[in-house]
Curated annotation (Swiss-Prot):
Subunit relationships: Homodimer.
Protein name (record): Transmembrane protein 192
Topology within the bilayer: Multi-pass membrane protein
Subcellular localization(s) per the UniProt record: Lysosome membrane; Late endosome
Annotated InterPro entries: TMEM192
Residues on Cytoplasmic side: 1-52, 111-137, 190-266
UniProt keyword list: Endosome, Lysosome, Membrane, Phosphoprotein, Transmembrane, Transmembrane helix
Organism of derivation: Rattus norvegicus (Rat)
Entry similarity comment: Belongs to the TMEM192 family.
Length: 266
């Protein structure tokens, strides 16, 4: 009897402790609410519009440079001046070179812009798109810097050997045309990659690999060791995953606290 009383008292104590626990008073959150709060939100890369705009500016500049060179210099190659004074007070080659410098500055600003947004994408867990466009992001600026070097070399030679002026103009236009072709290919390839990424709206790489584990296929996961990958690439990817998981856990903890305090507020 005494044991039964103690057991009964103990059960009452347990019931009282569970009833007094404020954490157990909260109602369980519905599944759709948790899914809506904890599912990572996709942020598309906003660099496609800027890339297309810069590409249009480049095409317009090269077209104007060719028209200016043909209409202004070819009638009198030794004069280096427009008959209608379109570039007055500048000479034709000077106007073309100044336009080229402005275009290079625009590409430099664009490269900084896309580097900023790609670093943000990498911090959100999209390491694959960051690595696949790593060299492509700076390739356009490298092409324009190489074109600037070629133009500087031509101007140095022209300064020492002024004649024939028409040949130097043809070489300058050839450099601009080659630069346009290379830069066009680079920016188009970059735009296609980013458009596919934005259209697919994938989840972070960690969650995409969880899908591969949940639904096995012939696609090998990149988290583990791969014989075709270098050790540096594997370590870099593991570091990106750790940074993303730390950031994601911090956001989850914050949202859990917000959701846990909502019933108390109501």
């Amino acid at each position: 009897m005494a044991a039964g009383g103690r057991l009964e008292d103990g059960s009452l104590d347990i019931l009282q402790s569970t009833d007094d626990d404020p954490l157990l008073d909260t109602q369980p959150l519905p599944h759709h609410s948790l899914h809506a709060h904890f599912r990572p939100r996709f942020h598309p890369l906003p660099t496609v519009i800027i890339a297309n705009l810069l590409l249009l500016i480049h095409v317009v500049f090269v077209t104007l440079a060719f028209l200016t060179g043909v209409l202004c210099l070819y009638p009198d190659p030794n004069e280096d001046k427009c008959p209608e004074n379109y570039t007055n007070p500048l000479k034709v080659q000077t106007a073309i070179i100044l336009g080229k410098v402005i275009l290079w500055i625009l590409h430099l600003l664009f490269e900084r812009y896309i580097q900023y947004h790609h670093r943000k994408v990498r911090s959100r867990g999209y390491s694959q798109i960051y690595r696949s466009t790593r060299h492509l992001k700076a390739l356009a600026l490298t092409i324009h810097s190489s074109g600037n070097t070629a133009l500087l070399l031509l101007l140095c030679v022209q300064y020492s050997f002024p004649e024939p002026n028409k040949l130097y103009l043809e070489l300058i236009l050839a450099v601009l045309a080659l630069e346009l072709i290379c830069s066009l290919s680079c920016l188009v390839l970059y735009t296609v990659k980013i458009r596919r990424f934005n259209k697919a709206k994938p989840q972070p790489d960690v969650l995409e690999e969880e899908k591969c584990y949940a639904y096995p296929s012939n696609i090998a996961s990149e988290t583990g060791f791969r014989t075709v990958s270098s050790l540096e690439e594997i370590v870099e990817k593991q570091g990106d995953i750790i940074v993303y998981l730390k950031r994601h856990n911090a956001l989850l903890s914050k949202r859990l606290l917000e959701l846990a305090t909502q019933p108390a507020r109501t």
